[in-house]
From Swiss-Prot:
Gene responsible for this protein: BUB1B
Effect of R550Q: In MVA1; heterozygous compound with nonsense mutation
Effect of R814H: In MVA1; heterozygous compound with nonsense mutation
SMART domains linked to this entry: Mad3_BUB1_I
Name this protein carries in UniProt: Mitotic checkpoint serine/threonine-protein kinase BUB1 beta
């Protein structure tokens, strides 16, 4: 109990202290209409240094936010700042700096037309008007500028100002103007107008009653006659008679002193009067005797000082209220100051000050005003600032408004830091944009190179097939016999004519080899396998062949000998395509030193062109020597790479007279073709002349006419999922596709399609009404059955690949009953036709051409349906890739506007040309093949797209942006989220669209099925009764456009 009492005593003591503090400071607190927060008021009145530091920090935070604000609503910062100042500076004055804050706010937001109808901006002006010398001028200025003319508060405050000046006629005119302008809220304005009329009527009645009372009072009091004759009285001294009435009459109590009337003796010219004490007492008693008179009105209570009405001091004041006494008592006696200073001891106790101490560091109430500062009207300063800003021609070279604006000044370093951060941010964004553009350009180049590579590979495969069908002789080769008269002389060199023939043959073969290898060099690089020496252990243990002279010491073969027939079939290629080094001067020193160009038979490693050509022949770091029996036994012989000195026939052995014997060994050389004779194993002459003689003792050579590069190590590049050949191979491996009842395969060419002609699909004839869409690989036609006006859609493809039918079949298989789209496919030799059953022909592209029918309700319905459709596609692991308006058909919900249970049946997809089945197509591919990515090319958000599923999310966002703003998607990065460049707040139900775009653009690595389901559920919550009624009206108008007759005549 004692503890409870102690706590209660402490609490009451604290409350008493707060009450004392409030009682000492309440007369300095300015009242607010909306009231004050008590906790903030107590902290503001505490007058502590810690509280003051907190206020200064908060004020500096507001100033910093105002200077470097980058959002879309700067008025919000000013509104919060001024509201905070009103609450934390209850005493007002110079310390709050309210007038300067309001001037800065209205000057900063003066050019923002969007705030002219904002109640917050009008509130700033009204607060500034209370500080102006002439508030009416401020209201006239606002009315001329069009600020707040659509708000009721503007007219209410304006009329109150006129009412305070008792100009009721003008105030009523202001109310009437506001009602005529239909200011919002109109009900509040009308209510204030009625209250104003009631107040004016009450004041008028009171004034009439007061005038009647004054007239009755004046009639009962004697009146002074106008222009009365004033006759003088007396013989010697003429005196004018005095006629006084009303309050000018002399009171009886005033007969004393100097104003007493003269006695009778003085009137009878008696000069000496003897004082009679008794007579004076009797007269005094008679005069002082009170007389009973009735009260005309009850006395006014004069103890209450706050109930008196202010008025003039010199009228209407009766003599009874004047101070009594002689005139001597009315003379002010000046105070006489002593000529000395009284002594005060130092130990004397000083008088106690009040508990509310004013800290001089916080309150500057008694500080002197700066002499150079002039006090002007805030409205005039705002107007002059506006005029100066319009006429301003000079440009400050530093951020003057950021340094000197507000209470606290910012240093140049802080301003430079902010400018540097801003430039750095812009520079990073520019770098990201540049890198994205370079990446897109490189990707485009890679795609073009892959396309060229596919064409070249297709051509090579066709040529290889043709060559394998032809029968070629096994030993049909062209031999070049070199006849020389100096056969007996071993040191004789080759003639120049023979060298020229051999050189021409070699250059022709090399040109063809490089032409065949060049397309492969442009494709994606395939890493070569590292050579493993342990894999050759079995080959090392093999015994050497029985016929050593027939062993060829050579590396791994890199060229294939072709027959003359195959050579002649390839000679129609233009020579400028064959070799990229044609016409290039090789960098050789022979022409400089000897004066002529050295022509060699073998590749010269010192020749730059030969070196570049040979670099393409290199595969692995090391090559082993293969024997003849290890070579393939096909009619095409393998040519050694560099050892041309080896004898290859018995005639050569007889001509040269020497048979070289060598052992089977493994030779390891570098990948660069070295200029050495390690593989020749010539006779061991040590002299240079001997080596020259040995190498030049070639009598006859076997030189092929053409060389063809082998493709043993080449691998197939990554197939594109949109390639028709790849899709054809994929569909051939699916037996369930051909077994489907909806697929009809006909072994004949596709019939020719013409407008107003009939085509047979199944067992029915259809008439082609219109060619709706023409694309690169397919067309869309509107057809109708014979003797019927019901239109439907067929898709005609130029490739015999029923990809759309395959996607529909997989959706039906994986989604079961959730997918209700029916279509049939007719496959021909040179194309296929997909017939979509039970759908309309009116696409979303047609609806966009009639933008006046696209209301908010229609947009919500279309996006909701699109979210549900794409959610089903992603559940089936299928990415559409082209959610454009041309492939979206309006269906049942549009034609049956009053069936509210079919809100998810408003759209249907009829084109799956860019779709990818991720369950089957497992190869890695680039996202640039999707049409959605091609449409949004250049957007930075595509650089963060890591999953194919996100492409459909961007497609939905782009379609919603197209419906709302009639243009494709434009986004920007604000530091944390991707947002639209357009202003969403101006749209109807802008909060819903803001959440939609932020969520769908920032899905990142989340599962797209959950994101789509969440957005669809949020969209579905909008379909209430009011929304459905508006939607039905809009659908009824759209239904007129979707009729078959209206479609055909568009």
């Amino acid at each position: 109990m004692a503890a409870v009492k102690k706590e209660g005593g402490a609490l009451s003591e604290a409350m008493s202290l707060e009450g004392d503090e409030w009682e000492l400071s309440k007369e300095n607190v300015q009242p607010l209409r909306q009231g004050r927060i008590m906790s903030t008021l107590q902290g503001a009145l505490a007058q502590e240094s810690a509280c003051n530091n907190t206020l200064q920090q908060q004020k500096r935070a507001f100033e910093y936010e105002i200077r470097f604000y980058t959002g879309n609503d700067p008025l919000d910062v000013w509104d919060r700042y001024i509201s905070w100042t009103e609450q934390n500076y209850p005493q007002g004055g110079k310390e709050s700096n309210m007038s300067t804050l309001l001037e800065r706010a209205v000057e900063a937001l003066q050019g923002e037309k969007r705030y002219y109808s904002d109640p917050r901006f009008l509130n700033l002006w009204l607060k500034l008007g209370r500080l102006c010398n002439e508030p009416l001028d401020m209201y006239s200025y606002l009315h001329n500028q069009g600020i707040g003319v659509s708000l009721a508060q503007f007219y209410i405050s304006w009329a109150e100002e006129y009412e305070a000046r008792e100009n009721f006629r003008k105030a009523d005119a202001i109310f009437q103007e506001g009602i005529q302008q239909k200011a919002e809220p109109l009900e509040r304005l009308q209510s204030q107008h009625r209250q104003f009329q009631a107040r004016v009527s009450r004041q008028t009645l009171l004034a009439l009653e007061k005038e009647e009372e004054e007239e009755v009072f004046e009639s009962s009091v004697p009146q002074r006659s106008t222009l009365a004759e004033l006759k003088s009285k007396g013989k010697k001294t003429a005196r004018a008679p005095i006629i006084r009435v009303g309050g000018a009459l002399k009171a009886p109590s005033q007969n004393r002193g100097l104003q007493n009337p003269f006695p009778q003796q003085m009137q009878n010219n008696s000069r000496i009067t003897v004082f009679d004490e008794n007579a004076d007492e009797a007269s005094t008693a008679e005069l002082s005797k009170p007389t009973v008179q009735p009260w005309i009105a009850p006395p006014m209570p004069r103890a209450k000082e706050n109930e008196l009405q202010a008025g003039p001091w010199n009228t209407g004041r009766s003599l009874e209220h004047r101070p009594r006494g002689n005139t001597a008592s009315l003379i002010a006696v000046p105070a006489v100051l002593p000529s000395f200073t009284p002594y005060v001891e130092e130990t004397a106790r000083q008088p106690v000050m009040t508990p509310c101490k004013i800290e001089p560091s916080i309150n500057h109430i008694l500080s002197t005003r700066k002499p150079g500062k002039e006090e002007g009207d805030p409205l005039q300063r705002v107007q002059s600032h506006q005029q100066a800003s319009e006429e301003k021609k000079e440009k400050m070279m530093y951020c003057k408004e950021k340094i000197y604006a507000g209470v606290g000044e910012f240093s140049f370093e802080e301003i430079r830091a902010e400018v540097f951060r801003k430039k750095l941010k812009e520079q990073r964004e520019a770098e990201l944009l540049t890198s994205a553009e370079k990446r897109a350009e490189m990707q485009k180049q890679i795609e073009e190179m892959e396309k060229k590579l596919k064409e070249i590979q297709t051509t090579q495969q066709e040529r290889t097939g043709d060559q394998q069908e032809e029968t070629m002789p096994t030993k049909e080769t062209t031999k070049l016999q070199i006849a020389s008269e100096s056969q007996k002389i071993p040191g004789m060199t080759l003639s120049s004519s023979v060298c020229q023939v051999n050189c021409c043959a070699r250059e022709t073969s090399l040109a063809e080899n490089i032409w065949q290898e060049q397309p492969h060099s442009k494709g994606p690089s395939v890493p070569f396998s590292i050579f493993d020496e342990f894999l050759l252990s079995e080959k090392k243990n093999k015994s050497p062949p029985a016929d050593p002279p027939r062993v060829l010491a050579q590396r791994r073969p890199l060229a294939v000998l072709k027959t003359s027939e195959s050579i002649t079939s390839n000679e129609d290629v233009s020579p400028d395509v064959c070799d990229e080094f044609t016409g290039i001067e090789p960098l050789s020193e022979d022409a400089i030193i000897t004066g002529f160009r050295n022509v060699t038979i073998c590749p010269n490693p010192e020749d730059t062109c030969d070196f570049a050509r040979a670099a393409r022949f290199v595969s692995t770091p090391f090559h082993e020597i293969m024997s003849l029996k290890d070579l393939p036994s096909d009619p095409e012989r393998l040519l050694p790479e560099e050892d041309l000195d080896v004898k290859t026939s018995e005639d050569q052995q007889t001509a040269c007279g020497t048979i070289y014997s060598q052992t089977l060994s493994i030779k390891k050389l570098s990948p660069i073709i070295e200029d050495s004779r390690e593989a020749t194993h010539s006779s061991g002459f040590s002299g240079s002349s001997a080596s020259v003689a040995s190498t030049s003792s070639i009598k006859c050579l076997q030189i092929p006419e053409k060389l063809e590069l082998t493709n043993e190590t080449s691998e197939n590049p990554t197939q594109s999922p949109w390639c028709s050949q790849y899709r054809r191979q994929l569909l051939k491996s699916l037996p369930e596709l051909s077994a489907s009842a909806e697929l009809c395969i006909e072994d004949r060419p596709m019939p020719k399609l013409e407008i107003e002609k009939e085509i047979e699909l199944g067992n029915e004839d259809y008439c082609i009404k219109r060619e709706y869409l023409i694309c690169e690989d397919y067309k869309l036609f509107w057809v109708a059955p014979r003797n019927s006006a019901e239109l439907t859609v067929i898709k005609v493809s130029s490739q015999p690949v029923p990809w759309d039918f395959y996607i529909n079949l997989k959706l039906k298989e994986r989604l079961n009953e959730d997918f209700d789209h029916f279509c049939s496919c007719y496959q021909y030799q040179d194309g296929c036709i997909v017939w979509h059953q039970y759908i309309n022909c009116f696409t979303l592209q047609d609806l966009l051409q009639h933008s006046e029918y696209i209301t908010h309700e229609i947009t919500v319905l279309i996006i909701y349906n699109l979210l549900t459709i794409v959610e089903m596609l992603h559940k089936a692991e299928i990415v559409h890739g082209d959610l454009s308006p041309r492939c979206l058909i309006l269906r049942n919900r549009i034609h049956d506007p009053y069936d509210c249970n079919k809100n998810n049946q408003a759209l249907k997809i009829v084109d799956f040309s860019y779709s990818v089945d991720l369950r089957v197509q497992l190869d890695v591919f680039t996202l640039s093949g999707f049409r959605t990515v091609q449409i949004l090319e250049g957007q930075k958000i595509l650089a963060n797209c890591s999953s194919p599923y996100q492409v459909d999310l961007f497609g939905i966002a782009d379609l919603a942006h197209l419906l709302l703003f009639k243009e494709h998607l434009q986004v920007f990065w604000d530091g944390s989220f991707w947002k639209l460049s357009q202003n969403i707040s101006e749209l109807k139900d802008g909060e819903l669209w803001n959440k939609f775009f932020v969520r769908i653009l920032n899905a990142n690595d989340e599962a797209t099925v959950s994101v789509l389901g969440e957005l669809a559920a949020e969209m579905n919550g909008v379909f209430d009764t009011t929304f459905q009624s508006h939607l039905n009206k809009a659908l009824w108008k759209v239904g007129k456009l979707t009729s078959p007759g209206a479609l055909l005549f568009q």
